[in-house]
């Protein structure tokens, strides 16, 4: 999201998480956050910002392996989501900026990116992606299980088996819109520990009520 980059090392066979490695978060500088905000508003040089974002991710990869004494040759693959600029699956449209070729060149590691487009073009929602990872985590958990992920957009994953009964969908706005509101109303960057939210009341009429599976359109 616009806060920065989360980078993590995991060992996986593609079906389950075999080992959880180190992770770090690299905050974006205020000026770069503004560039992302401008792109979402339809302003700015998309290609220039995309390259800058990609190189910031390359720096995050470098910091991760350096801080935890990992050889880059031991990294087989980088999953690169990029940054969502617009998302409207009803019109078979989604756009995440991030140059996979540039990241591969900068790091020397193969990159998988543009993770949503094919699903959206095939008539899917393209979101959320988290349930795929949650399914891998659930292989070591007792079922049924529910995982709630509150990121920029909140989503939930539910499974009673690990066959075809995995359900995952967006539950509504997460920290992205909340952070924007907090910044506008208080000048702070976020609601620390949910203090302000805990003082409020739920407006049932404003809840996102369309049936699952669903995503939150941006």
Where are these regions (language model features)?
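Short beta-strand-loop/turn "lid" adjacent to the catalytic site in phosphate-handling enzymes
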Residues: 44-100
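Short polar catalytic/cofactor-binding loops
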Residues: 1-3, 30, 215
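Glycine-rich phosphate-binding loop plus the immediately following alpha-helix
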Residues: 5-8, 22-38, 112-139, 146-207
């Amino acid at each position: 999201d616009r806060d920065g980059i989360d980078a993590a090392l995991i060992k996986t066979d593609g079906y389950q998480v075999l080992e959880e490695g180190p992770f770090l978060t690299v905050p974006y500088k205020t000026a770069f956050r503004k560039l992302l905000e401008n792109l979402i508003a339809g302003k700015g040089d998309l290609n220039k910002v995309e390259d800058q974002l990609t190189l910031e991710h390359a720096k995050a990869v470098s910091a991760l392996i350096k801080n935890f004494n990992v050889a880059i040759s031991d990294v087989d693959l980088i999953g690169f989501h990029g940054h969502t600029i617009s998302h409207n699956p009803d019109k078979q449209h989604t756009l995440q900026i991030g140059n996979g070729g540039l990241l591969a060149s900068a790091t020397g590691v193969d990159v998988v990116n543009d993770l949503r487009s094919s699903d959206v073009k095939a008539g899917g929602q393209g979101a959320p992606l988290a349930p795929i990872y949650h399914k891998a985590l659930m292989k070591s958990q007792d079922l049924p299980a529910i995982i709630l992920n509150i990121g920029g957009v909140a989503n939930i994953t539910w499974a009673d088996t690990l066959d075809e009964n995995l359900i995952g969908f967006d539950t509504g706005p997460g920290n992205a819109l909340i952070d924007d509101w907090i910044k506008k109303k208080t000048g702070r960057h976020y609601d620390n520990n949910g203090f302000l939210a805990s003082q409020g009341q739920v407006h049932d009429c404003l809840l996102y009520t369309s049936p699952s599976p669903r995503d939150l359109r941006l």
